[in-house]
Amino acid sequence: MPSQTSIAEIRSENYRFLQQHVYSHAGIVLEEDKHYLFESRLAPIVKQLGLNSINDLCTLLMATRETQVGRQVVEAMTTNETYFFRDPAQYDAIRTVLLPRLRRERQNMRTLRFWSAAASTGQEAYSLAMVLLEDGFSDWNIQILGTDLSSPVLERARSGKYQQIEVNRGLPAALLVKYFRRSGMDWHLSEA
């Protein structure tokens, strides 16, 4: 079994390769001082594949252009930090500036489409949906598209299932009981 140090050591040419790989597939810029991110986040992939080091992982990626492993590397380097009503000032601006304007400009069409890029597990997209419903847009045709580089987090978003700790983080109690139903230790979005 290789030591943790041997797994984590990255030769400079491999570090540059990883930087370029992540940038070209995700647009994420990882500066020279981010070795620790590669080391901590790629070590589990190295172990899972039975490799001896991150350098071996780079060799595999360069030699085969293995798309599944390449995707795992990119997903490992993304930060899936999200919670309900993250950045309250943003939601205030949506309520007080954007929605009144959209209501005026789209009154005849009554259709709105939003894109939640880097949606992670969906809390921010669902927060937007709740804002729209609370602000009287329930009879409008609303579409919110959530996208993310990570397939597993998108699957979680689609499920609409959240743990208690996740709903406690930013979600007002009144909206929790209005838009979610409890199921054991979890909360599921209802069809409101």
Where are these regions (language model features)?
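Conserved AdoMet
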Residues: P2-W115
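Conserved SAM-binding loop of SAM-dependent methyltransferases across substrates and taxa
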Residues: T121-S138
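Conserved RecA-like P-loop NTPase ATPase core
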Residues: I94, A119, A157
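Extended basic-aromatic, gly/pro-enriched interface segments that bind polyanionic ligands
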Residues: W140-A192
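Short, well-ordered alpha-helices that flank and scaffold nucleotide-derived cofactor binding pockets
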Residues: T96, P100, M130-E134, S159
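Alpha-helical elements of the RecA-like P-loop NTPase motor core of helicases
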Residues: D92, Y126, E155
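Conserved S-adenosyl-L-methionine
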Residues: A118-S120, D148
